[in-house]
Amino acid sequence: MSNSQTLVVKLGTSVLTGGSRRLNRAHIVELVRQCAQQHAAGHRIVIVTSGAIAAGREHLGYPELPATIASKQLLAAVGQSRLIQLWEQLFSIYGIHVGQMLLTRADMEDRERFLNARDTLTALLDNRIVPVINENDAVATAEIKVGDNDNLSALAAILAGADKLLLLTDQQGLFTADPRNNPQAELIQDVYGIDDTLRAIAGDSVSGLGTGGMGTKLQAADVAGRAGIETVIAAGSKPGVINDVIEGLPVGTRFHPQQTPLENRKRWIFGAPPAGEITVDEGAQSAILERGSSLLPKGIKSVTGNFSRGEVIRIRNLEGRDIAHGVSRYNSDALRRIAGHHSQQIDAILGYEYGPVAVHRDDMITQ
């Protein structure tokens, strides 16, 4: 559908448990129903789920939250499989498949792993599969301590090229003060820029099961906003909250991005110093400039410099004129080996492949 949106929905532990010590399955069923409804309407849904530790505790019958990181990781290891089984079971009611992705911050900071994660996420969405993302809590350390699922959801939104990020919590949104102890607190409905004043009034969650608070949600909104993604913080218990966000209705606190994702990407590609350059033939030049096509290895005449997969490179024509900048899907050595060859030969030449193109049109800005 032409107006299809990509929505990342992050569900905190407080939302999944309803403030109790157990997963609130009835509540999760309702959220899945809304996601399935939007999925059927042609929208692309990504789930970022907390709750592995809570699910592990419930399954093992632990009476209290352990104080050590190792104990939390034990619970996460047990609970993660229970959690994905629940998501799989509920989405299957609507004939929807899910795909699990376990990530850590390191996956986002390493260029190669970032691109691989993006490729996987894109493949899932393109095949109408709902990605279910969580931190790999069983091996992560700092992430568990800081409640990074909020920030992880922002990074997932960037990976997915999302239009909107919805952070569901146990509060209606961001207030001028903590509404739990200040009856004069008012809901902030629209935010056009995050400053120190806003950060100062962001309170923290009191959930004994989760690790995120309003402060980390503000960080996530800031990260997403810099990438041109709108963020909404809203109560997971609000009826129809996912539908409202898709339809753009007033709900919770809406963080308006300062620029569109395309503008942000253009700025990044143009702003990044090229790590190398490639020269292309006339056919490739015409395909790029006149038809807006991706660059195929067949059209590459030469490769200059040493660069890694995921770095920005300069694309020049045979006369030496810059025609585009783009993100290379292969490193310089690999490009030299596949230059001039058909895409079908990539795997035979390299022993692997990251797709048929050298630079994808979505990762390319023409001069």
Curated annotation (Swiss-Prot):
HAMAP family per UniProt: ProB (MF_00456)
Assigned protein family: Belongs to the glutamate 5-kinase family.
GO cellular component: cytosol
Amino-acid positions noted as binding substrate in the UniProt annotation, renumbered to this chain: 50, 137, 149
Gene3D superfamilies: Acetylglutamate kinase-like (3.40.1160.10), PUA domain (2.30.130.10)
Purpose of the protein: Catalyzes the transfer of a phosphate group to glutamate to form L-glutamate 5-phosphate.
Domain (PUA): residue spans on this chain: 275-353
Superkingdom as given in the UniProt entry: Bacteria
The reaction(s) this protein catalyses: L-glutamate + ATP = L-glutamyl 5-phosphate + ADP
Record pathway: Amino-acid biosynthesis; L-proline biosynthesis; L-glutamate 5-semialdehyde from L-glutamate: step 1/2
Record EC number: 2.7.2.11
NCBIfam families: proB
Binding positions (ATP): 10, 169-170, 211-217
GO biological process: L-proline biosynthetic process
UniProt keyword terms in alphabetical order: Amino-acid biosynthesis, ATP-binding, Cytoplasm, Kinase, Nucleotide-binding, Proline biosynthesis, Transferase
Primary location recorded for the protein, binned into one broad class: cytoplasm
InterPro entries in the cross-refs: AceGlu_kinase-like_sf (IPR036393), Asp/Glu/Uridylate_kinase (IPR001048), G5K_ProB (IPR041739), Glu/AcGlu_kinase (IPR001057), Glu_5kinase (IPR011529), Glu_5kinase/COase_Synthase (IPR005715), Glutamate_5-kinase_CS (IPR019797), PUA (IPR002478)
Compartmental location: Cytoplasm
Gene Ontology molecular functions: ATP binding; glutamate 5-kinase activity; RNA binding
One Pfam short name: PUA
Organism name: Cronobacter sakazakii (strain ATCC BAA-894)
Name this protein carries in UniProt: Glutamate 5-kinase
